């Protein structure tokens, strides 16, 4: 199955996107329910391969969401005349804001730990799902501007010194335990 939840899933439960034989799914359903977040974070997606396909697209969406969050935080960070407190802002946005989300919670946690993201290189890896999502979009003639742009931004980060890329690297570490490249 396609599985989401990162390092948090072990304690909070996972989101399981299951593909395969429907009869086997039904036999295993109690296991999926037990592993899932709130006993609801699982579902049958269809034939074999469909669960991983849905998870791949999920990760492409995640790329775009994280990129827009990183860009917005970069704009706030660059507006020096206001001396904005990014930790306070992300804490505020967690309550009632349209952009509230688990990713925002994780960004707030990262900023609480390290407000300037000191020591984090602005270098963002990709683990393949964004590339595969874009290839599917190309094959299906579906425009995927945000996902494509977010992947290309990750490529660009490898030759950059931008705060937004430190945000992205921190987010990947927060939700998935992905390695962060440390700055020299």
Question: Where do the PLM segments sit?
Answer:
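Rossmann-fold dinucleotide-binding core
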Residues: 1-71, 79
């Amino acid at each position: 199955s396609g599985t989401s939840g990162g390092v948090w899933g072990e304690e909070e439960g996972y989101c399981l996107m299951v593909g395969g034989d429907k009869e086997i799914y039904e036999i295993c359903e109690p296991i999926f329910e037990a592993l899932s977040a709130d006993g609801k974070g699982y579902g049958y997606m269809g034939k074999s391969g469909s669960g991983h396909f849905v998870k791949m697209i999920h990760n492409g969406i995640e790329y775009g969401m994280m990129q827009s969050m990183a860009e917005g935080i970069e704009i706030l960070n660059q507006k020096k005349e206001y001396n904005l407190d990014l930790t306070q802002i992300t804490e505020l946005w967690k309550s009632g804001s349209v952009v509230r989300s688990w990713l925002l919670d994780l960004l707030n946690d990262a900023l609480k730990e390290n407000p300037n993201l000191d020591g984090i290189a602005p270098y963002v890896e990709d683990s393949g799902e964004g590339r595969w999502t874009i290839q599917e979009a190309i094959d299906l003639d579906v425009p995927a501007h945000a996902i494509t742009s977010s992947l290309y931004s990750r490529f660009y980060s490898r030759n950059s010194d931008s705060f937004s890329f430190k945000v992205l690297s921190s987010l990947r570490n927060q939700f998935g335990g992905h390695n962060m490249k440390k700055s020299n």
